[in-house]
Structure formats: structure tokens, C-alpha cells
Amino acid sequence: MSANRSQVCNYKTRNRKERQRCLWSVQCLTLLLLAALGCVSAAAQSVAYVPTHKSNSVAVVNTATNSVIDVIPVEIQPLSGAMSPNGQEVYVTNSGWIFGSNSVSVINTLSNTVVATIPVGNFPVGVAFTPNGAFAYVVNSNANSVSVIDTATRTVVSTINVGASPWGVAFTPNGAFAYVTNQSTNDVSVIDTATKSVVATVPVGNNPVGLTVTPDGAFAYVANYLSNSVSVISTATNTVVNTVPVGATPITVAITPNGASAYVPNDGSNNVSVINTASNTVTATIAVQANPRGVAITPDGAFAYVSNRIANTVSVVNTATNSVVATVMGVALFPEAVIIR
């Protein structure tokens, strides 16, 4: 009987210790899981990067609070930028050619620090990544060319000649073609990305600047700065199939993820034209602040962020109501563009 009581006691003690160890393991695993989820949540958080031309920096905006949470120094006169498809890097063009910039700053989005600087051509402006993230195309406005950067080595591997004073660049979703606006020749160069050569030239309006391609790849929307219009190019035929009148001096275009609406900042009339892409008509005009230049849509399509160059602010537009619901202050001098992760 005594032996049995001892065995029972040892059994209970052993079970209690095992339960404690098990509980400790579960607690540790829970903490690790919460930490991992916190990291994933931080990485997945929607953030806007705003190059500020006169401050030689990039403001980082938390889109949940619409406040500036960081400022990243870059080189002279940053003008535009693009987010890598995996969301890990932002490429920012530094256009201060007079001061010897002519470069691209590579920002790590986890640390919000510049991890590389890539020399490119004279007066780099527009930049875009291929959909697979393998290459970035940088438009060199004073060199009438496009620098092709291998994103793995962060080096220029090719240079493509285009029209005069090129500005913007956008890819078809399959990555087969890049569309580049040429301001001085009033046209768009179509680049075959396999051969890295121009295969078509599409006449558009006067002084084309920014552009984007619809999510289905069927059309390219081109902002014509001096024509106060947007040219709609069929990517199947590389011809203009529609021209949409907008506000004064439109500068760029962003399209919602569902492809239903195009948002066009008009820096001469201090507003944003909203185009219904099914009818190619303006269905709303949204007043913002002085000299709107850049625009980007959040991944869920709920908001458009518009940089106001002279006001030194960013207007936050609710795309459901097409009204300004917030204004981001403190983004420094001359915000030129918006890039959203």
C-alpha cells in the first residue's frame, strides 16, 4: 500500500511538472506567434512615400493615421518613385542634374533607409518596375533615353533611346511592353521588353507627362499637360481610341485596382478629375490644395492620395464619395509624387 501511495504521489508530481512545462511551451509559442504576427502586420501596413523635391527627402506617411512618421534623406531634387512588386523597396529618382545627382535612391521599406544609389542618365524622372520585379525602367528626360536597371545587381544593364524629353513610364500587366511619354514630340514610345527596343510610336496630345495602364492591360491613359486632356490608347492596336477633356494642365493618372475609375490631378486648376473608364467621361471633380502633382491609390482602392506641390500637403480622397477626408501636413517642401505600399 505504501509503495502504491508513493507511486501515485510520484505520478501526480510528474504530471504536474509536465503540465507546467507544457503550459510554459504554449506560452512561449503564443508570444512568438504574436511577435511574428506583429512583424507581418507592420510589414503589411499601408504606407505612402512622398518625394519632396525641394527638401531632398522622402516623407513617410502612415495611411492609418494620415501623419508623417519618418523622413528619409535622399539625393538632390527627388521627383518620382515606384514601389517594387514585393513591397520591399522604393526606387526614387533624383533629378538634380545641375548638381550632379542623376541617380536612383533605393529605399528599404522595413528600415526606411537608403541602401543603394544607382547612377542613371541625365535628369531622371519617371520610374516603374516590371511586374516580376526583375527590372526597373528609369526615364532620363535630358538624355532622351530609358535606363534599364537589373534589380538583383542594382546596375544599369541596358539603355533604350526614345522620343524627345521623355517623362513617364508604365508597363502592361504581363510585362511585355513599356509605354513612355515624350513631351517634346507629343507621342508615346512603346518598348518591347524582350528585345528592349521601340516597336511603335503613338501620337497623343500636347506635352504628355504621366500615364498608367489599366489593370486588365487593355488601355493606357496618358495625361496631356498642355492639351488639358487624357488620351486613351488601345494597347492592342497602339492607337488613341478616346480623348477625355479634364482640368487645367493634368500631370499624371492613377487607376483604381478594379479598373473602374481614373484619378487625374490638374495642377493648373487645383483639382482632381475622376474619369469613369467604361464611358471615358469625367464623373466628378474634386477640389484639393495648390498645385496637385502626384496621385496614388491604396491597395484596397478606398483612398486616393494626392500630393499638392505648392501647398506642401497631401490630400486624402475617399474614392466612394470622391471627397477630401483628410489632409496630411508636414511633408516638407514641394511634394511631387506619391508611392503607396
Residue ranges and their predicted role:
Residues 1-23:
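N-terminal secretory signal peptides that target proteins for export/translocation
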Residues 33, 37-341:
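Predominantly soluble domains enriched in secretory-pathway, periplasmic, or organellar proteins
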Residues 19-34:
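Sec-dependent N-terminal signal peptides
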Residues 6, 28, 39-42:
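Intrinsic disorder/low-complexity segments in short proteins, especially the signal peptide
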